[in-house]
Structures are given as C-alpha cells and as structure tokens.
Amino acid sequence: MKLKDYTIYIVTLLIVACSPSYNLQSIDDEVIAIEAPIDSTILNIILPYQNSIEAQMNEVLCISKMEMKKGKPESLLGNFVTDLCLEQFSESADVCIMNTGGIRSTLPKGKITRGEIYKLMPFENELVVLELNKSDFDGMLEYIASRGGEPFSGMKFNSSKESRELQVFSLGENFNFNKEDKVRVLTSDYLANGGDKMWFFKNKEQLKLGTKLRDAIINYCSNSDTISSKLDNRLTITEDE
C-alpha cells in the first residue's frame, strides 16, 4: 500500500473511532405521492390484456338458486364443493374431504361468474387421491369431529360431543373394512401434504388427477344451467348420555 493511501486509511479510522455515537429516538413517516404521467405506450400494451382478463372474469358460468356460505358442522357451500369434486372423480375416489379455511368466500344467489370462483378458490391447489387404512380413516373422522366439522362428501357419520365415539352410517356401496380394503380419499395436494394439521395423510402415496380444485368447480358450473346445494345431516354431533 502506498504511503499516501495508508495515511488516508489511518485518518479515516481515527475519524470514525472518535465520532460520537447516536441513538435513534423517533421516526416520522410521511407518504410522498409520486406524480408521473402515464406512459401511453405502456398503457397501450397493457390494456388489451386487461380487457381480455376482465372479459374472462365476467363470463357467466351458471345461475345459483341460492346463496351458499361456509359453516360448521356442515354448510351449503362445503357440501357443494365436495359433492361436485366427488361426482367428477367418483371412479377414482370413495370420499372427498376439504377444509373450511380453504374456501375463501361465499357464492351469491344469481349469476355466478368465473371471477366469483376465483374469489372462492384463489389457490393453485391440485386434486389428488390417497388411500387410507382403517386406522388412518378413523383418524380422519376424529379430526373432522374434533374441529366441529369440515367439508366432506361420500359418507355420513355421527360423533358424540365429549367421548368422540364415532358411528359411520354410510360409506359407499358394499364397502367392508374386514376385507382389508382401503378408503380412497379425494382432497387437495395442500391437505395431502399435511396442511391444516391433517396428519393422517402424511407419507401416503398420492395419485395426481391433473386438475386444479378451482378448475373442477369451474368445469362443474360451466356444464350446469343452475346450481344448488342442500344440508343432509352428513355429520351429526350429539351430546353424551
């Protein structure tokens, strides 16, 4: 290092070392608006895409006969979503389960647009099927009951409120665990990977169906003039005697 450079280096260190230290006492923040003219060239590029997307989102898919909301122990919206999924993939699955938290909005009565479905299901979740043995299946039922209900389709069962004693009323046709059968469960890849504490799905092989949950809803609505749902007591939670 040259003598001149070395001298500058030493002086700089001394200045920094001898400088008084400061403590931050307060911060004042202020929003400063940046005013800039809109670039017409960029705007002309963006507008066609914006108009195309708006046209797609405003497309009317079907008419809903009722307003559908999520809720527990069962709901019109939860039953609607899981029923339509199981209907479309009945050859691959016996039951379907989703989670209330994954349903992000309500479906209004009247016109249902593509945009409404995107608000309902904004995530890119894929549909998958997993096989559960009796132990894991019972764990799934206990999970649903412990949370006061989650959206499911393809079965009906009762749970006592305190003891969590389970009684399955119906599960497919001619289904028998005595034959060491496994239940094929349709769900989202997020839940299949243990999301929302669905531990009974962990480390299970997943059959990917190549369809997003949102697309399954859109497909169903697109192929229906009208849609509706109903409550059928698929889950009842009773008081212990």
What does each of the following model-derived ranges do?
Residues 4-11:
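Sec-dependent signal peptide recognition
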Residues 15-17:
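C-terminal motif of bacterial Sec signal peptides marking the signal peptidase cleavage site
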Residues 21-35, 79-82, 86-95, 100-241:
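Feature captures C-terminal
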Residues 23, 40-47:
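Contiguous mid-protein beta-loop-alpha structural module that forms a pocket-lining wall or clamp
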Residues 34-35, 49, 53, 65-67:
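PLD-like (HKD) phosphodiesterase/transphosphatidyltransferase domain
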Residues 55-69, 197-201:
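Acidic/histidine-rich, surface-exposed loop or edge segments in extracytoplasmic proteins
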Residues 70, 75-76:
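A conserved active-site cap/scaffold subdomain adjacent to cofactor or substrate pockets
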